[in-house]
């Protein structure tokens, strides 16, 4: 403080008050030198008298002074400031405000540290539990709003107005009764745009690091993502594993901040603030949702599957570009936590509705736009969550406004920013505007505010020059025409960035030197272009260029109505509350309050300072508030902010939504007026950084001097040397404090002058005015004997060290020790919490120790979600649709029969399984699933039947036989490349395989090869007794049976009788080497290894043999030959030396059996064999003898009639199908002759539905129809725009593109009119605008009519869009009502008026309508040829032409479609045209007959067609396939059904060119849709009796064949 100069014995650095330094030391240089001298002896602070504190960050500890205690430290000075403010609060009843100022938002000036010391000091003055809650609240604020920047780990990114509320019961020590956290404009852009080398908000890192394994599992965090909690560096594996887009570079996950502990403290703080555990868990789920939103990957895809809400030219030929989410697993996590359906959430990312020129349009977004949409949702969620938490805190800590007597306000706003780290110009502008305003308040407090009162009191003080930033402050913040007001006004008006820049230039050019706009002269360089698109503001801390690109859109800060309506369907109560809070201001439609048009996250605090809610009383004033008319305005504004949210929202509804700049300006104005109120005493804390490199204990004079100059500290110090007055006391109060009684005689002024003389206070600290005395705070304290008062300091809860425990034992914060700076130690927004030596910052360690509370312990260390729904349950709830009661419609008999078939095929799948595992809670969805399954089963059954019919059926009729005729056996003789086969007793063996294994191997293969193709039975004599049991069960071994070959023509070649090789195989009884079983063993071996088949005997050949006296016959398909037996080929022979026994029976076969073969030679004896009168034992013995001795082969039935049928039946079917194809081709040839067009005078309508096509496609389609060689006056071009939608790649809505092509200026804006649309419920009401005029192109002047479906005013998403079918119905319903003379809707009346009165043609004159898709180009003669065909045959109802590809050579996929398109038209449609029954008239290029030529009877627009085609109730799978997947084909079906006497035709002479899918995925998707539509429409056509042709070859049969071929196509292709 000013006083006598220090004596020579006192070192210069001992003087803490800068104004007390000599006058020659009051320059910037000398003051900087003085600060340096104090800094180097451990005194990093100085004072500007009693009103301001200057603090330098030492980057070491802020709690130790030169002597090792807190004396002289930043912490000690903060305590002293708090005590003085608290004392003044109690003694004078004044509101106190401490304003923090620093020259750079990224300075590392230690601001947050000083603020925490200051708050801790204030809280230590009260012993209520509320003190702890306020410390927790401050910690939560820092956790949610603080981040790490390049230069400091504790960069606050939201303005803080922290209010401590006191009652007035005690004039000495006021009681703390409440508090309030008022946050101003969080830097939302940081959520989705983390600058390089910086972090997002700390709480996101806390969540990732501090959750347990079970919690990570629930939140969808990969368990393999390892975040170390030891404070060390990340391992390479954990860094490289996964990158969180919203968390910056992976290295930022660990920068020496103990995130895991921070998360535990964050949860504990919320619990201490009385937030329920379930709500804290919901907070964490929303934070996890935000992180997952950053992980979504969007890709472009093609979609051809249409719904009721889709439309356009792509519906028949091409595809629509859509944006889809690549990683569906992440999407499902987000959907679960938000309580939404996965599909609807994914769809919402792909479009965005906004207002352009007073019209709402839906923009179809590309992947980049979808990414921005997801970023916007993340910003909205975080902003709402922060607002929700702060409002919850305030509800718990704020006292009733009428009980608050005084307040202490701590203002800490982000500092000045030279450049935007996140790329957000708006955040930078608003932050700098706030800093500019606070600095202006500082200057006003020191210079202007006191000067006005000094003049009134006739006190003269020397003037002090200073830098006044009023120009910049007024230019930025002036209400009405300040820069922020202009920005807000231009945003409301929907102006562009360039228009805003022009407005700024007009407002400030040559009027305010602080704001300039870049030169508008011509320039080509990037620098000059950038200068022209920016404005410059000369702030007190330097000039800043603000680019305007995207500034107005960012200022709008609009949350689209799409998102709001999506969130209204959430199944999560918390998310519903989040989006229902007052912080989200919604705009509803005036006529339909339930429809939310858009919303905005408020940039204005939800609460106001307590002092702003009431006028200042007449009690003890310090200095007067600024005079003017703003007091009433201030009161009015304060009153308006205290009204209910409903009133606020209705005001916003009437006046338009206020932008972020306007809201921030309003809140800043309230702050400014609170600070300028009469009963408030401000203190200022200037936070300076000693160097730019964050080096501990290093003082950079140049760096500090620049900050001293920026803040004007030298000028302020000089001002205080002249007038350091902080308090004004009226004479009576002054004399009462002086206690001089009646000792001095004179006036009050004279008495006061005597007191001042006695006190010997310096003149710059005490002066007598006309009505009172001006005093500095030091003099007032001396006068009031405040030094005798003791401010109580209460210990922190659970502390053993008294009051200091709540203060920072070390400058707890991010800016403390070298160890913290250089090593990975604990840092977090509560870095103050983790004090060294167990000391704390905001709160004591015990308070934050979850173990002190059993519940908190389980909450902190376990799974906080264990009592909540699992993620799967949340997802299931989100996917559930709200069940609505629907009217029961009568079910047709065919539907009942079909459902009976469905349940018959799917009965084995219980409904609860579909509901549980299939996640289909709705009954109609489950029924549709059953129908799909039934159709699949029918298709696969059909395919299985086709496979059976093709593969198995011939085998059933004619089983495969492995037999060889004698000719076939002879051909396998090993010659000319043939195989070598040999037969033995009717069995054929593979000789080629046998020869290598023949024993002995000395026999050459050549010798064996001569038997190839022969019957070698003669080489193998048999032992009869070993192979046949005979009649009695045994045969004498001497009985022999000779073998003799058949010499009938056609018999197999046998071994020559002169071949003696049989002796090597003779092991009969009479030989020296008797082996009875040798033959049987060899046959078993041969059959097992070399078997090929049997000798085959056809029935004819058998009969021939029988006629030749061969006793041969077949039993059960086996052929037996008893010729040798009957002829006496039985003899006996005994071994040498033995005699034949007497009475040997040589007839070992039963006589009845032999007699059977003799009686019926060459026949099938099976029936006679079964009827033979012998015993079963005898039958069994005779069967064994026949098989072993007389078997010669199998009956060969390969040429039987049955086998011939099986062979040629499939062939006949194939030939029949080929004949159909050939017939179709021949029928197609009948249409090769082109009809010659003539000059025609019929009126036609050319209709084009437009959806999201680009300008080039639309122009091609429109121009091609306008240039058709048809009388321009007799054709009407009608373009129907399906909704206000901006397609991907377009810069305007589709209707605007169409109108620009047709030359309709933007000034033409007709009123939207109502009409009936296709939709459910309220969707049936739609509105449209009608435009008409003449379109001129290449010499053609064509009348046009444009119908723009804009939707009801309450429609938000895809306004007006109802689908292509609805676009067709606009004209169909209009023409129907014209011809039937029915009442019309307002829009239809307008269409009638435009056509009848503007264009000048009676709508009934139009006879034909040509429907063309927006991506189709028609040939010049197309309309003429179609009309000629329709006139040539008045029984033709519809005619289509040939559609070719305009992108045939774009890709391989389009190339393969060229042939398909050609065949489908010139073969299929040409054939169908022969019958006059085209089953599908393509919507992309078809002309219909509106009315009959003779009677005028409506045809295309008849009541039956219009009613059936406008079906709204599409609740079955069949109807969905008809109306949603193939509306063109279904329309053709209706025409054939309701007008059976009329024909549908195809003419190849009419040409059009369309766009086909270029990717294989889209091609498959399109074909899948077409196949579904084809099958269901063919099913509709089958019952029609009118599908007849000539003779029996009917079109109905061909349709049935097409249906079958479509169903079994997978099999036929295979």
Swiss-Prot record:
Glycosylation sites per record: 1047, 1072, 1572
Reaction(s) this enzyme catalyzes, per UniProt: [(1->4)-N-acetyl-beta-D-glucosaminyl](n) + UDP-N-acetyl-alpha-D-glucosamine = [(1->4)-N-acetyl-beta-D-glucosaminyl](n+1) + UDP + H(+)
Disulfide cysteine pairs (residue numbers): none
Region (Actin-binding): 668-692
Signal peptide: none
Annotated knockout phenotype: Causes strong chitin defects in the cell wall which results in over-compensation by other synthases following activation of cell wall integrity. Leads to a reduction of chitin in the lateral cell wall. Reduces drastically spore production. Leads to resistance to AFP, a small, basic and cysteine-rich peptide that exerts extremely potent antifungal activity by inhibitiing cell wall chitin biosynthesis.
Main location, first listed in the record: membrane
Record's keyword annotation contains Membrane: yes
Acidic residues bias locations: 626-635
Compositionally biased residues, Polar residues: 9-19
Cellular compartments per GO CC: cell septum; cell tip; myosin complex; plasma membrane
Boundaries of every Cytochrome b5 heme-binding domain copy: 961-1020
SUPFAM superfamilies: Cytochrome b5-like heme/steroid binding domain, Nucleotide-diphospho-sugar transferases, P-loop containing nucleoside triphosphate hydrolases
Annotated function: Polymerizes chitin, a structural polymer of the cell wall and septum, by transferring the sugar moiety of UDP-GlcNAc to the non-reducing end of the growing chitin polymer. Acts as the major chitin synthase in Aspergillus niger involved in cell wall integrity which is principally responsible for chitin synthesis at the lateral cell wall. Plays an important role in septal growth or maintenance. Mediates colony spore formation.
Family label: In the N-terminal section; belongs to the TRAFAC class myosin-kinesin ATPase superfamily. Myosin family. In the C-terminal section; belongs to the chitin synthase family. Class V subfamily.
Domain description: The N-terminal myosin motor-like domain (MMD) does not seem to have motor activity but is indispensable for polarized cell wall synthesis via binding to actin that ensures the proper localization to the hyphal tips and septation sites near actin structures.
Protein's name in the database: Chitin synthase csmA
Organism: Aspergillus niger (strain ATCC MYA-4892 / CBS 513.88 / FGSC A1513)
Organism lineage: Eukaryota, Fungi, Dikarya, Ascomycota, Pezizomycotina
Gene that this polypeptide is encoded by: csmA
